Amino acid sequence: QTQKLLNNPSGKLVFKVADGKCGVAVEIKNASEFTPASIVDFMEKNSFDLVEEFIIQHPKLTELSPSAVNTVRIFTQLNANNEVEILGCRQRISVNSSVDNMAAGNLAAPIDEVTGIVIGPAVYSDITKPEEINHPVTKIPIVGFQVPFWSETIAMVKEAALLHPQNRSIGWDIVITENGPGFIEGNHDWCKLLWQLPAKKGLKELLEKHQL
């Protein structure tokens, strides 16, 4: 299994700590630097708990921003009838960073739930910085960007939300590859800034009807 990991198609490995958040304590290394034995030594020496292959994202997302895997965040909420409601969708966009988290200085933009099109400019968590209509490095338009495989992404997330009814509200991190969407993780304590800043308004009323 370790050798298979070292031979993954991207040629890269992602090391993480188990309790990491916001892109902190993440390191990306070339798989060619390791053997099955040395990878364990490296993790123990540097206090890493997890290692996974670096995922190759969809070419359109690489064109938008090649420095990191640019994930989609979708917020789901189970209502009183155990039906899945979408609270919001965001495209995270890296800016010369190996991670895409807003807390690490990157961008996030609102996505239309129905079409999968980015419908507003991207913003930073630092509200003193200007919003971005185009990517500041690649100059690719952000507003109007079509997230690939959108209908498949929404269907996948809704199905997953129903599998975890004990967690009523989850912030899903989705990677879009050339073969379709896949899960990175689901967050029970999802970031309210990522939810509200791209919308440019408070969204508390969406939670109040669920008594949250």
For each feature predicted by the language model, list its residue ranges.
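Short, solvent-exposed loop/turn segments at secondary-structure junctions
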Residues: 19-22, 56-57, 81, 91-94, ...
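Well-ordered beta-strand positions
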Residues: 75, 175-176
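Generic recognition of flexible, low-complexity loop/linker segments
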Residues: 2, 60-63, 158-161, 170-173
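ATP-dependent carboxylate/phosphate-activation module, predominantly the ATP-grasp catalytic core
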Residues: 64-65, 69-155
